[in-house]
Amino acid sequence: MLSVVPSPVLVRAPSKVNLHLGVGDLRPDGYHDLTTVFQALSLGDDLRISPASALTVKVNGEGAAEVPTDRTNLVWKAAVRLAHLVGRAPLVEIVIDKGIPVAGGMAGGSADAAAALVGLNELWDMGLGRDELSALAAELGSDVPFALHGGTALGTGRGERLLPVLSRNTFHWVLAFAKGGLSTPAVFAELDRLREHGDPPRLGDPQALMQALASGDPAQLAPLLGNDLQAAAVSLKPELRRTLRAGVTAGALAGLVSGSGPTCAFLCESADAAVAVAAELAGAGVARSVRTASGPVPGARVIDPES
């Protein structure tokens, strides 16, 4: 009897921007308590997952050489974890086409891990629900559960405990990618250092920001955007100050460093305004490249190869 080889599965993984990122003091276990509001954005990575004779991970696109393709990659770990759960060997090839900047503060690695869970669940016909996949996602990393769910959400703990947040509009963003990345642990360590030597401003409660999201008004949302890690990212990469100024000068409503950086995200009034801001930023020479994106969008999901 002939066995049927499953067709490859294509999965889209969204990037994210932290609209609010409040960072608590360093805990004894080396982590920080976070209060964050995530929004999933249309800029994303695509993963193609196919049956193979051995587990392999391949990466294409800008920054591909900086992404490990061995067992240290979160995608590799996701495949091994899911295969172990069902008692099978992880015999798949996973090809990642990068759209999310590497080490850019937009959770590209976490998004890819979430996409791997979704794609393998489909390829292997496991029938796992989102809650079961979420539990696996939380074991892989604190940003992976949000990449799985997408939309807009409030994250607490290390960011892995999620509550959906009502967002009544599509918000339009311009993303300025910096030359070179920033290490997330290095940015947190720099924040700890800055706090030891002074008292950089800390964000308060995100309630007003969540009300602005529910209103759907970007002008109401703009002044409420904030990131406790921004001071540390700018301290390590001072040229980000110029990028942030340039985006607002170009017409953005507000700008902030995304997550641990160094990508800068600019909220705009409309899709047309975002195109205009992106064009001006691209000509200003303050970023390696510039993209537009919108959100919120769904989390990691299987897509039609033709889409």
UniProtKB/Swiss-Prot annotation:
Q: Which EC numbers does the record give?
A: 2.7.1.148
EC main group: transferase
Tell me where on the tree of life, at the top rank, the source sits.
Bacteria
> Example GO molecular function term?
ATP binding
Report the catalytic activity: 4-CDP-2-C-methyl-D-erythritol + ATP = 4-CDP-2-C-methyl-D-erythritol 2-phosphate + ADP + H(+)
InterPro entries given for it? Answer: GHMP_kinase_C_dom (IPR013750), GHMP_kinase_C_sf (IPR036554), GHMP_kinase_N_dom (IPR006204), IspE (IPR004424), Ribosomal_Su5_D2-typ_SF (IPR020568), Ribsml_uS5_D2-typ_fold_subgr (IPR014721)
Homology family: Belongs to the GHMP kinase family. IspE subfamily.
Q: Does the keyword Acetylation apply?
A: no
Kindly list the positions annotated as binding ATP: 101-111
Report the record's Gene Ontology biological process terms. isopentenyl diphosphate biosynthetic process, methylerythritol 4-phosphate pathway; terpenoid biosynthetic process
Give the protein's function: Catalyzes the phosphorylation of the position 2 hydroxy group of 4-diphosphocytidyl-2C-methyl-D-erythritol.
Could you tell me the gene encoding this protein?
ispE
One Pfam family name is GHMP_kinases_C
Statement: the UniProt record of this protein carries the keyword DNA-binding: no
Keyword vocabulary terms for this entry:
ATP-binding, Isoprene biosynthesis, Kinase, Nucleotide-binding, Transferase
Q: Which SUPFAM superfamilies match?
A: GHMP Kinase, C-terminal domain, Ribosomal protein S5 domain 2-like
Q: In which pathway does it act?
A: Isoprenoid biosynthesis; isopentenyl diphosphate biosynthesis via DXP pathway; isopentenyl diphosphate from 1-deoxy-D-xylulose 5-phosphate: step 3/6
The name this protein goes by in its record: 4-diphosphocytidyl-2-C-methyl-D-erythritol kinase
Gene3D superfamilies found in the cross-reference section: 3.30.230.10, GHMP kinase, C-terminal domain (3.30.70.890)
Q: Which residues form the active site?
A: 16, 143
